[in-house]
């Protein structure tokens, strides 16, 4: 494995065939994102199955992420299709169900007329169009267009500063989550997280279905930034979703929030994704801007586990080129250094201390790899956050753990039989690494595991081993 940083690709109309999904995997996709804000269940099921087939065909671990819409507020539909709101026009956004016209359109947020006040801003399509509330008349919020632009069906609305009372999980989200879990997705992302308690609502649905998978908190609201530390602790991973975040917060604050979120996630051994507009110009062009290349590189330098493509791979003209370009940028950064900003965290847990010790032993002895046996992936994540230049190989008996670790920095995961003894683990390391062809007898590796084997949370062992030697 040469590239350590991971790539998340959003699937959509631009990648909706067996051949295109296979090409995405071959180009470097590590995690496939199913965006439940768009498409229907048939689309998502077909995409999921294509990813699984492509993963098996290539032998590459590819995770599947279900991204829930969350309490996203949207415009309704326009009867005559897309329109253009010009500066100075008056338009009405209504909570009543209606067929939209140029100057009156519905919204999915049925409490807008209650929550809005004169002077509030209403931002459409990630802030491309800006309205100001002039008044309320019954079900209608009357607005003046202050920054005009094109609008079309189902465009998102942001209400910065407004106290939105929507629940963390809508009825649609509950249905989508149930479907995604039954489908077999590996990861779930929750949109518009505001507090650590939001994850409990997701867990309640998961427990009813009878299947828990890691939950990713998407940072998109000012409340999430205010509660960042407790959200990082409560959730399994973090996504810095800069589109809505950049609408809800002053634009100049977003890079600082990104750096703070990445660092805090790493301090707590939680994987972190940086998302939105990373190579946005490649939706239409075969090459990114230099600024976009720098954006991807800086996310890698900050220590992000993964960077994400959205419209570039879902609706863009050059999805494969976007993945290959992102991969080249990541590799160029890593060819210079795999280091990330130093952690201030002082490990206090057994697994935390062991991960630091294993890294130090491996680097000082010039080992060829760190090998971690894992039941849940936790020990591997603790090793990954240290950004060691040594290859990080995870061995697990659980296919779902292999797919979940596809999002974790620098990790290459292998399915092995359930181990029952330390000697069995070491023999399995020899067998797997020699079969891989990148290692030879006599190579030094550092093994991290738990004794007795097979117990979640039992990591307590570091073993320095030369491949092929009977040193149990």
From Swiss-Prot:
Which residues are recorded as binding Mg(2+)? 220, 244
* Cofactor requirement: Mg(2+); K(+)
For the keyword Nucleotide-binding, the answer is: yes
Residues binding ATP, per UniProt: 35-38, 74, 155
Pathway assignment: Carbohydrate degradation; glycolysis; pyruvate from D-glyceraldehyde 3-phosphate: step 5/5
A Pfam entry, by short name? PK
Name the keywords, alphabetized: ATP-binding, Glycolysis, Kinase, Magnesium, Metal-binding, Nucleotide-binding, Potassium, Pyruvate, Transferase
InterPro entries from the UniProt entry: Pyr_Knase, Pyrv/PenolPyrv_kinase-like_dom, Pyrv_kinase-like_dom_sf, Pyrv_Knase-like_insert_dom_sf, Pyrv_Knase_AS, Pyrv_Knase_brl, Pyrv_Knase_C, Pyrv_Knase_C_sf
Q: What is its EC number?
A: 2.7.1.40
Domain of life of the native organism: Bacteria
Q: Is Transferase set as a keyword in this record?
A: yes
The residues the record assigns to binding K(+) are 35, 37, 67
Tell me how this protein assembles.
Homotetramer.
Q: Which family does it belong to?
A: Belongs to the pyruvate kinase family.
Which sites bind substrate? Answer: 33, 243-244, 276
Kindly list the GO molecular function terms attached to this UniProt entry: ATP binding; kinase activity; magnesium ion binding; potassium ion binding; pyruvate kinase activity
Please list the reactions this protein catalyses: pyruvate + ATP = phosphoenolpyruvate + ADP + H(+)
Listed name of the protein: Pyruvate kinase
Q: Could you say which residues are annotated as the site Transition state stabilizer? A: 218
């Amino acid at each position: 494995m040469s590239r350590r940083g991971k790539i998340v690709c959003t699937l959509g109309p631009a990648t909706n065939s067996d051949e295109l999904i296979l090409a995405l995997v071959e180009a470097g996709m590590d995690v496939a994102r199913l965006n439940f804000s768009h498409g229907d269940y048939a689309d998502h099921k077909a995409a999921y199955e294509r990813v699984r087939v492509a993963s098996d065909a290539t032998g590459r671990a590819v995770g599947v992420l279900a991204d829930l819409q969350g309490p996203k507020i949207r415009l309704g539909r326009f009867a005559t299709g897309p329109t253009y709101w010009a500066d100075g026009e008056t338009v009405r956004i209504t909570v009543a169900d209606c067929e939209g016209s140029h100057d009156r359109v519905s919204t999915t947020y049925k409490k807008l007329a209650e929550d809005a006040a004169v002077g509030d801003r209403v931002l459409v399509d990630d802030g491309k169009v800006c309205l100001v509330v002039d008044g309320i008349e019954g079900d209608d919020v009357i607005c003046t267009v202050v920054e005009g632009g094109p609008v079309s069906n189902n465009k998102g609305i942001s209400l910065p500063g407004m106290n939105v009372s929507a629940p963390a999980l809508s009825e649609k989200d509950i249905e989508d989550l149930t479907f995604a879990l039954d489908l077999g997705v590996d990861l779930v992302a929750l949109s518009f997280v505001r507090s650590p308690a939001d994850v409990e609502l997701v867990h309640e649905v998961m427990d009813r279905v009878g299947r828990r998978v890691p939950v990713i908190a998407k940072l998109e609201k000012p409340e999430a930034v205010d509660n960042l530390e407790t959200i990082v602790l409560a959730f399994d991973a973090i996504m810095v979703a800069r589109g809505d975040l950049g609408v809800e917060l002053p634009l100049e604050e977003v890079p600082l929030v990104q750096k703070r979120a990445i660092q805090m996630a790493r301090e707590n051994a939680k994987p972190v994704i940086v998302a939105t507009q990373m190579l946005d110009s490649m939706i239409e062009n075969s090459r990114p801007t230099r600024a976009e290349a720098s954006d991807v590189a800086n996310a890698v330098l900050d220590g992000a586990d993964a960077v994400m493509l959205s419209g570039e791979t879902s609706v863009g003209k050059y999805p494969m080129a976007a993945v290959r370009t992102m991969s080249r940028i990541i590799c160029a950064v890593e060819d210079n250094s795999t280091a990330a900003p130093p952690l201030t965290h002082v490990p206090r847990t057994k697994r935390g201390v062991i991960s630091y010790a294993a890294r130090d032993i491996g680097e000082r002895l010039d080992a060829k790899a760190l090998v971690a046996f894992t039941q849940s992936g936790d020990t591997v994540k603790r090793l990954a956050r240290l950004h060691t230049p040594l290859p990080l190989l995870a061995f697990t008996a659980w296919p779902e753990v292999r797919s979940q670790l596809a999002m974790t920095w620098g990790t290459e995961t292998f399915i092995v039989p359930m181990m029952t003894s330390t000697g069995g683990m070491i023999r399995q390391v020899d067998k797997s690494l020699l079969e891989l062809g990148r290692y030879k007898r006599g190579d030094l590796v550092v093994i991290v595991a738990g004794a007795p084997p097979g117990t979640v949370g039992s990591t307590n062992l570091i073993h320095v081993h030369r491949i092929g030697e009977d040193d149990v």
